């Protein structure tokens, strides 16, 4: 087949193999992605500022409008932007306290509270949008990577050692640009659990306020996260896979080695790029907040300013919010994706060989 790459399969077959891997990976890993996004998108609790020794808190009625002060009752105040506030005329003497169930203290706490208060299906919220985005993005990305790597190595434009790094970075940069609007919508669905109708209204408002450019809100930190991630991932993957393949018989499939190599390289890349993932999530979730407070989306803080702000407000720990779910997700998702992709390529290689022999 003239249109086959050096691995013996066509670009279309590469896209089918990678798209299948994307579906399998999304079904298994979406719950961890939902938890990661929810952990990253929540603001630092005001409770820690008002009552450091307890997460149960209230505000003085003197700060409320007179119409609310006159009620003399405990009430829950929600303005749609900040966290819910429990307001009590008796202050600390009141026996009834409000504890915000949407505040998460960790990964397991997030899993338990999401299931308890929102239902198990919430763990797969945004899955349709995830599949709509992930399948074409992964098909484009993996196919572009293999084609670029073959191109770079075939024309000796770079050494075989660094070809995976360059090819991975270029492939991811193009994919991020094409898929960025869908990534924004998926993050919005997972972080605030809005309906598709509400999401559409939110997007229309953002476009009306800031133009079509607002749909690429978060492109900068997404690129800063994904391009280095891709470069690090493929560089380490090819190295680890090459090393592991030295321990297997020549007639043994390399899918198992790909699984291990993918998990290791994905973990390393995820740790090093996590701060940019936090910034990307907060910037994209801010789309709804901009609508609520009527902020012009064109005037957004730079990635570096957001990094400094997060560190000032939450410390270095804030830059690694969602660390555990991201790492827990990165290792198996990268392992599942690359091993499924390699299995698909092996399947098509055998299929093409059988066709040649049969023809």
From Swiss-Prot:
Q: List residues in topological domain: Mitochondrial matrix.
A: 36-121, 182-214, 280-317
Fill in the PTM field for this protein: Cleaved and degraded by AFG3L2; degradation by AFG3L2 is regulated by the ability of SLC25A39 to bind iron-sulfur. In absence of mitochondrial glutathione, SLC25A39 binds iron-sulfur, preventing cleavage and degradation by AFG3L2. The presence of mitochondrial glutathione prevents iron-sulfur-binding to SLC25A39, promoting cleavage and degradation by AFG3L2.
Membrane topology term reads: Multi-pass membrane protein
Regulation affecting activity:
The activity of SLC25A39 is regulated by levels of mitochondrial glutathione via its ability to bind [2Fe-2S] iron-sulfur cluster. Upon physiological levels of mitochondrial glutathione, glutathione prevents iron-sulfur-binding to SLC25A39 promoting cleavage and degradation by AFG3L2. Upon depletion of mitochondrial glutathione, SLC25A39 binds iron-sulfur, preventing cleavage and degradation by AFG3L2.
One GO BP: import into the mitochondrion
Q: Name one GO molecular function term.
A: metal ion binding
Tell where it localizes: Mitochondrion inner membrane
Q: What is its main location?
A: mitochondrion
Question: What cellular component GO annotations does this protein have?
Answer: mitochondrial inner membrane; mitochondrion
Could you say what the effect of mutating residue 329 to A is? Abolished glutathione import into mitochondria without affecting the levels of NAD
List all topological domains (Mitochondrial intermembrane): 1-14, 143-160, 236-258, 339-359
Q: Which UniProt keywords apply?
A: 2Fe-2S, Heme biosynthesis, Iron, Iron-sulfur, Membrane, Metal-binding, Mitochondrion, Mitochondrion inner membrane, Repeat, Transmembrane, Transmembrane helix, Transport
Q: Where does [2Fe-2S] cluster bind?
A: 74, 78, 88, 94
Tell me the protein family, please: Belongs to the mitochondrial carrier (TC 2.A.29) family.
Described purpose of this protein according to its UniProt entry: Mitochondrial transporter required for glutathione import into mitochondria. Glutathione, which plays key roles in oxidative metabolism, is produced exclusively in the cytosol and is imported in many organelles. Mitochondrial glutathione is required for the activity and stability of proteins containing iron-sulfur clusters, as well as erythropoiesis.
Q: What is this protein called?
A: Mitochondrial glutathione transporter SLC25A39
| Lineage of source species | Eukaryota, Metazoa, Chordata, Craniata, Vertebrata
* Gene that specifies this protein: SLC25A39
């Amino acid at each position: 087949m003239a249109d086959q790459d050096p691995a013996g399969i066509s670009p279309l077959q590469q896209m089918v193999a990678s798209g299948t891997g994307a579906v399998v990976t999304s079904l298994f890993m979406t719950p961890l992605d939902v938890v990661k996004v929810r952990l990253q998108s929540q603001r630092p609790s005001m409770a820690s500022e008002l009552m450091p020794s307890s997460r149960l808190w209230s505000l003085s009625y003197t700060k409320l409008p007179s119409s609310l002060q006159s009620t003399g009752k405990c009430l829950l105040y929600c303005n749609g932007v900040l966290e819910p506030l429990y307001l009590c005329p008796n202050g600390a003497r009141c026996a009834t306290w409000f504890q915000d169930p949407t505040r998460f203290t960790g990964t397991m706490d997030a899993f338990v509270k999401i299931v308890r208060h929102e239902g198990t299906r919430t763990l797969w919220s945004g899955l349709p949008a995830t599949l709509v985005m992930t399948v074409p993005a992964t098909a484009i990305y993996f196919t572009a990577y293999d084609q670029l790597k073959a191109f770079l190595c075939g024309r000796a434009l770079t050494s075989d050692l660094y070809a995976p790094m360059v090819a991975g970075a270029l492939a991811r940069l193009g994919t991020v640009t094409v898929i960025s609007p869908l990534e924004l919508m998926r993050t919005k669905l997972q972080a605030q659990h809005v309906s598709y109708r509400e999401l559409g209204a939110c997007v229309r408002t953002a476009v009306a306020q800031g133009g079509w450019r607002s749909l690429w809100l978060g492109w900068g930190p997404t690129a800063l996260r994904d391009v280095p991630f891709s470069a690090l991932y493929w560089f380490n993957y090819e190295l680890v896979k090459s090393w592991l393949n030295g321990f297997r018989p020549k007639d043994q499939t390399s899918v198992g080695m790909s699984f291990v190599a993918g998990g290791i390289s994905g973990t390393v890349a995820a740790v090093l790029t996590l701060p940019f993932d936090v910034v990307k999530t907060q910037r994209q979730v801010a789309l709804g907040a901009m609508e609520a407070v009527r902020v012009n989306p064109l005037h957004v803080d730079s990635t570096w300013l957001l990094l400094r702000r997060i560190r000032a407000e939450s410390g270095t720990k804030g830059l690694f919010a969602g660390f555990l779910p991201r790492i827990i997700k990165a290792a198996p998702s990268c392992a599942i994706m690359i091993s499924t992709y390699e299995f698909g390529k092996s399947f098509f290689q055998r299929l093409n060989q059988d066709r040649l022999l049969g023809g």
